[in-house]
């Protein structure tokens, strides 16, 4: 499949720059994958599509305020996006980072001294004379939420709440699992009261999710691995539920990557125990992939030429998805992280 199939034209005024004041009042495009039928609903009406005995699986990862503003000795500012902690010692803590430019040398973050370095496998910041907990405190106090570049404004204090799901609890992501942003606690309670089983997994969203595809053939794209955890009892429950004819609703492409990465054996074990599967997956889901767990997908509208859009094409016939996107654009849906949602069922 050629990368051009993932391209489409989006008016810039449809890129949501801020969230709605009420999470569950966003619009919901329902796409029936067998027939191609499209419905236009409000997100809180999603409860009508869930039946007693179905499982709704959410990603409980929490976004860290991973964007830091540092100062060079010259007084110039440099913006740093923290990717993940690589190692720490009694004196130094090292994080993988992304920045504009290739500056190497000392930087100052508040009263703390750090050093930016390049090597053959990436770009790093070394926090000197600091422990890992102290660095994490610095991030929480001085960091900004890592809003995507298509949001053309500076992060504000309210983004710390808005760019976070109401059920986020496991620190580790540098981007939100955006499909989950539409749920309120009240909506989840309503869903549970209907007899739907709410279950959690963790997948820490990293560069792998939003890294652009730069090859012409999708098959040649390589995903960066992302860490996940799944309770072993959930896997048993999933297979029992599916055998009973009930459905698995996955909230977002990140939840889906964890579930299908595990089910496909496309993961590297990271210390699984008697209770949890712990691993990292670099699975890339694109058309012709055979889904083993997920029956219904809740997701946002994705960027052109992106890996999440490739997953959506894999989950539902490409031409049906393209038609749904065209209709969403015609009807003025809001796109991307703070935008509206789709249910593919």
Swiss-Prot record:
GO terms for cellular component: cytoplasm. Its main location: cytoplasm. It is found in: Cytoplasm. InterPro entries: QueA (IPR003699), QueA_dom1 (IPR042118), QueA_dom2 (IPR042119), QueA_sf (IPR036100). Its EC number is 2.4.99.17. Pathway: tRNA modification; tRNA-queuosine biosynthesis. Keywords: Cytoplasm, Queuosine biosynthesis, S-adenosyl-L-methionine, Transferase. GO terms for biological process: queuosine biosynthetic process; tRNA wobble guanine modification. It is an enzyme of class 2 (transferase). Belongs to the QueA family. Transfers and isomerizes the ribose moiety from AdoMet to the 7-aminomethyl group of 7-deazaguanine (preQ1-tRNA) to give epoxyqueuosine (oQ-tRNA). PANTHER family: S-ADENOSYLMETHIONINE:TRNA RIBOSYLTRANSFERASE-ISOMERASE. Monomer. This is S-adenosylmethionine:tRNA ribosyltransferase-isomerase.
């Amino acid at each position: 499949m050629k990368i051009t199939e993932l391209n489409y034209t989006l008016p810039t005024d449809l890129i949501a720059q801020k969230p709605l004041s009420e999470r569950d009042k966003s619009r919901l495009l329902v796409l029936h994958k067998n027939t191609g039928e499209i419905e236009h609903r409000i997100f809180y009406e999603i409860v009508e599509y869930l039946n007693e005995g179905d499982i709704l699986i959410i990603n409980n990862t929490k976004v860290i305020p991973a964007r830091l503003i540092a100062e060079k000795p010259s007084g110039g500012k440099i913006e740093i996006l923290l990717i993940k902690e690589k190692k720490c010692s009694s004196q130094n803590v090292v994080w993988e980072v992304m920045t504009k430019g290739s500056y190497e040398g000392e930087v100052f973050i508040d009263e703390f001294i750090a050093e930016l370095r390049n090597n053959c496998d990436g770009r790093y910041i070394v926090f000197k004379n600091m422990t890992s907990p102290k660095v994490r405190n610095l991030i929480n106090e001085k960091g900004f939420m890592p809003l995507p570049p298509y949001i053309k404004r500076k992060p504000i204090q309210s983004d710390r709440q808005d760019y976070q799901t109401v059920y986020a609890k496991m620190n580790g992501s540098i981007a939100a699992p955006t499909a989950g942003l539409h749920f309120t606690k009240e909506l989840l309670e309503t869903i549970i009261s209907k007899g739907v089983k709410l279950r959690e997994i963790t997948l820490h969203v990293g560069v792998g999710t939003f890294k652009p595809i730069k090859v012409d053939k999708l098959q040649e794209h390589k995903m960066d691995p992302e860490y996940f955890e799944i309770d072993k009892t959930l896997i048993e429950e999933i297979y029992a539920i599916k055998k009973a004819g009930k459905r698995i609703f996955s909230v977002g492409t990140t939840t889906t990557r964890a579930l299908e990465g595990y089910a496909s054996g496309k993961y590297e074990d990271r210390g699984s125990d008697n209770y949890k599967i712990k691993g990292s997956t670099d699975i890339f889901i694109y058309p012709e992939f055979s889904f083993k767990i997920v029956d219904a997908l809740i997701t946002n509208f994705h960027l052109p030429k992106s890996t999440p859009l490739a997953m959506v094409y894999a989950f539902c016939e490409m031409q049906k998805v393209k038609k749904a996107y065209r209709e969403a654009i015609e009807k003025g849906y809001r796109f991307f992280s703070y935008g509206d949602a789709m249910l593919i069922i």
